[in-house]
Each structure stands twice: as C-alpha cells, then as structure tokens.
Amino acid sequence: MIILYVHALAATGVVRNVRILAAELAARGLAVELVTALPGGEGVTGVPHHALLAGPYPSRPREKLQAIAALRRHLQSRGQATLISAGNHGHGTAWAASQGLRDVRRIYRISNDIMRSAVGAPSGGLGRLGRTAMARLLARDADHLVLVSPILADTPAFAGAARAGKVAVIPNGIDADAARFLADGPVPHRWMGRTPPVILAIGRLALQKNFATLLAAFAILRRQRPARLIILGESRDRACYSLRAQAKALGIADDLDLPGTVDNVFPWLAHADAFVLPSWWEGSPNVLLEAMAVDVPIVASRSAGNAVDLLDHGRCGLLVDPADAAAMADALARQLDLATAIRPGDRIDHFGLDALSDAWVRLLR
C-alpha cells in the first residue's frame, strides 16, 4: 500500500502534484491511498481518500498533534506500507507519526527550497535554523528523499543522504494536451485581448513570490510603454492591502488588478501577452509548466526552482535576477515586443507525465 500524505487537499501546487501522482500510480496498477489531516477538497477518481480528523481545530499546533496521533494509528492499521509525505508542510507530521514503525517505508518529497538560498531572499532568521534542523532530521530518517529540482541537491543537509544513495530527483510534469484543452475558453478578463498588453503573474500573495520587486519592475516598464499587470492568487487582506499601497505609491494602481484565485488558470495564461514568475525560491513550479504548455512568452527568476532547466538556460524564456527590478523590467519589455519575444515552443514536451510516472514506479518497486 502506498499512502500519499498532505495536510489538506487545498488549492496549492503541492496538492495538484499529489493528485497527478496518485492518478498516475493508480493507472500503473499500484495500490494508492490519499490521506489528509483535514476533510474536504477535490480527490482523485478511483483513489480512496481518508481524512484523519473531523475538521480543523482553533489551534494549529493542537491540530498538528491530533493529526500525528491519528496518522500513527492509521499507519499501524495498514501494516506494511510506503508513506510518501508529498509536501514540505506535512513532513513534520509524517516524521513524528511514523517513528518506530518498522513496516513503514518513508519517502519525503522535498517540494520547495528549504534553505531559501537566493541572494536577497527573506530567510526567516530563526526559522531558517528550524528548517535546517528539520532537513537534517528528514535526511537521516528517510528511506528516500525525492527532490523536485536538481538545485535542491545542493542543500548541505542532504549531502549525507546523497552519498548513501537515498536521493532521487523527480521534477514535476504536466499533461500539455489537457492544458491546451483547458485553455480553449473565452477571454477571462476585460483587459485581455486588446491593448495595452497584459502581463500575468500567478501565486499566493506571499513574500516568497517576490511581487514587491515585480511591482517595482512594472513601474519602470510603465515609464517606457503602456501595459497592465494582473496577479492571480490567494491572499490575506493584509497582503493585498500592502501590494495595493505599493502600487499607489509607484503610480501604477490603475494598471494593476488582483482578482484572487480562479478555478482554471489556463485561459488566463493563453490570453496573456507575457507571463512572469519573480519568485525568490520555488521547487519545481507548476505554474511555469502551465505557462509553457500554452506557449506564452515567459520571464522567470533564476532562483525559481528549476526554471533555468525548464527554460533551457534562457533559450525558451528570459531569466533574471529576482532582486534586479530594472533587469526584470527590461526582460518584460522584450517579451511584450513581437520582434524580440522568445516563446517556449515545444520545450514542454520534455516534461510530460510519462517520465514522472516512470521515475516514481522505479523508485517504489
């Protein structure tokens, strides 16, 4: 039995990858179960979903403790099993719940850059020390570490596991044909399909995504030419207010829209004139694969996970320093110009689901 664990089936990149992985492994004839701490969310047809708790707790620490106890009982009931903790936020629960269970093989999928190593990135101070300690703990405990990007192999805490042959690199993949089918829809926003051109960014309104630098870059671009910027993504009121206040101070508030989250990003990507991923750090960004699938001109930060590899070292999209607003503005200007824009072309064909499935099946068998 393969148990795929995440805390909840929320609208995140990790959860999208869990659904893909569950479906692919089940299609290969492997017994798979989705286990979450919290109920709800979109599951996978043909794959059982077991929620450990009846609902969320007012206290997140208490919720985590209850999830640990419930996951341990669930693992004990399953006997021999492979536990795949599919995202960084669930590793602590998976580690604590599985200690001392000899019939449980533990695989930790490192879904993001734990060390946040890009120059200028917010490191989190004491939080960085905690993340380092957790990385070392996972590396010692794991039967396998699965890294979603080759750059994560440079994490010092994983060096011992790599020497022991416990590290595998399995990047995310995408069904490009399905993405193109989903992109075939009406224009999703009043700004799209007309002038001035629209730049699209997608991601939680969080420090990791580096939207403050993007706004600074967009302000530089707006002094050179007309353009508009749409940022899709989940946010708290405070984050949204902060970005709107920055946009107002920069004089670009009328050309910025923050519509929140949407169920289907592909029509947005297909009708955008350029896509930008300014993140300080990532793992293997789904949204970059999604943009590549619909062949929109792309600007991405070099530190956004495996963006350098995905964009073939700049041959299929432009790469920039995430701290350099002027360079980001210049790259956006080039990608909005039909004479200089670089598109991904068929690069996405190198990152299909067959390669992802084959790699996981080899590891699990």
Where are these regions (language model features)?
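Membrane-proximal helix-turn-helix segments that form the acceptor-binding/catalytic region
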Residues: R72, L126-L145
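Glycosyltransferase donor-sugar binding loop
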Residues: V35-G41, I174, I202, R228-Y241
